[in-house]
Curated annotation (Swiss-Prot):
Coiled coil location: none
GO MF: DNA binding
Protein's name in the database: Probable transcriptional regulatory protein MADE_1004275
Biological process according to GO: regulation of DNA-templated transcription
Family of the protein in this entry: Belongs to the TACO1 family.
Transcription regulation among keywords: yes
GO annotations of cellular component type: cytosol
Species of origin: Alteromonas mediterranea (strain DSM 17117 / CIP 110805 / LMG 28347 / Deep ecotype)
Source lineage: Bacteria, Pseudomonadati, Pseudomonadota, Gammaproteobacteria, Alteromonadales
Keyword entries, A-Z: Cytoplasm, DNA-binding, Transcription, Transcription regulation
Record localization: Cytoplasm
NCBIfam families: PRK12378.1
Broad class of where this protein is predominantly found: cytoplasm
HAMAP family named among the record's database cross-references: Transcrip_reg_TACO1
Length: 240
C-alpha cells in the first residue's frame, strides 16, 4: 500500500506543477466546502483542513479568501460532485472525481479523454470496489510502536502503519480522518504532515508497458487539463 501512495504522490506533484489549475481546484473545493458547511473554519473542520492544505500547496491567501467570501455571500455557481470510473491505457483502473456546474459539459469532456486515448469509460462502481477509501497521513519518524500506542489509546480504528525511509504512513478508514489527525496532533503538537488526505488507494497495481506509456501520459494530461476534474486516482505503475 505504501508504494501505491508514493505513486499517488508523484502523480499529484506533476499536477501541482500547473499552478493555475491548482488555484482553480482549491478555489472550487473551498467554495463548495464553505457553502455547505459554513464559512467559519473554527466550526467547519473540513474547511479548516482544506485551507491548511491549500496554504501548504502555496495557494495565495487572496484565492482562499475570495472563495470563502463568495460562499458566505450566497452567490455563485451550484457545483455538484461527480465521479467517473473506467479503464485507462494499459488497462489500468481509474477513478475521476469532478466538481461541476454543468453535468453535460463534464461528462462530454471526461468521455473525450477516454475516447481519444483508447480507454474505456465504465459504469458507476466499475472499478471503485478495487480501491480502498482511506484516510492517509504521512510524516517523518521511525517509531511504529509509539505511533500505534498513541492511536490505540485514542481508541481510533487504524488499517495499517508503515515505516519506510524515515517516514511513517498511517492508513485508516476515511470516516476516522479527524479522529486520527486529532490523536496524532495532540500527542505530537509539533508534528508536520507531509500528507494528510482522504484518498482512493488501489488494492492491486497494473504495470504500464513502455509501449502504452505515451498514451497513458496523454490520458493523464487530458484529464488534468479538464477544468471540472479535481482528482484522478489510478492503480498504474509506470516504468522507472
Amino acid at each position: 500500500m505504501g508504494r501505491a501512495f508514493e505513486v499517488r504522490k508523484a502523480a499529484m506533484a506533476k499536477t501541482a506543477g500547473a499552478k493555475t489549475k491548482v488555484y482553480s481546484k482549491y478555489g472550487k473545493e473551498i467554495y463548495v466546502c464553505a457553502k455547505n458547511g459554513g464559512a467559519d473554519p473554527d466550526t467547519n473542520l473540513s474547511l479548516r483542513r482544506l485551507m491548511e492544505k491549500a496554504k501548504k500547496d502555496q495557494v495565495p491567501s487572496h484565492v482562499i479568501e475570495k472563495a470563502i467570501d463568495k460562499a458566505a455571500g450566497g452567490a455563485g455557481e451550484d457545483f455538484q460532485p461527480m465521479r467517473y470510473e473506467g479503464f485507462g491505457p494499459g488497462n489500468c483502473m481509474v477513478i475521476v472525481d469532478c466538481l461541476s456546474d454543468n453535468a453535460n459539459r463534464t461528462i462530454t469532456e471526461v468521455r473525450n479523454c477516454f475516447t481519444k486515448t483508447n480507454a474505456k469509460l465504465g459504469a458507476q462502481g466499475a472499478v471503485s470496489h478495487m480501491f480502498d477509501h482511506q484516510a492517509v497521513f504521512q510524516f517523518e519518524g521511525d517509531d511504529e510502536d509509539a505511533i500505534l500506542e498513541v492511536l490505540m489509546e485514542a481508541d481510533v480504528d487504524v488499517t495499517d502503519v508503515e515505516v519506510e525511509d524515515g517516514k511513517v504512513t498511517v492508513y485508516a478508514p476515511h470516516t476516522e480522518f479527524y479522529q486520527v489527525r486529532t490523536a496524532l496532533t495532540e500527542a505530537y503538537p509539533d508534528l508536520s504532515f507531509i500528507a494528510d488526505e482522504i484518498s482512493w488507494m488501489p488494492q492491486t497495481e497494473t504495470e504500464i508497458s513502455e509501449e502504452d506509456m505515451p498514451m497513458f501520459e496523454k490520458f493523464m494530461d487530458m484529464l488534468n487539463d479538464c477544468d471540472d476534474v479535481q482528482d484522478v486516482y489510478h492503480n498504474a505503475v509506470t516504468p522507472s
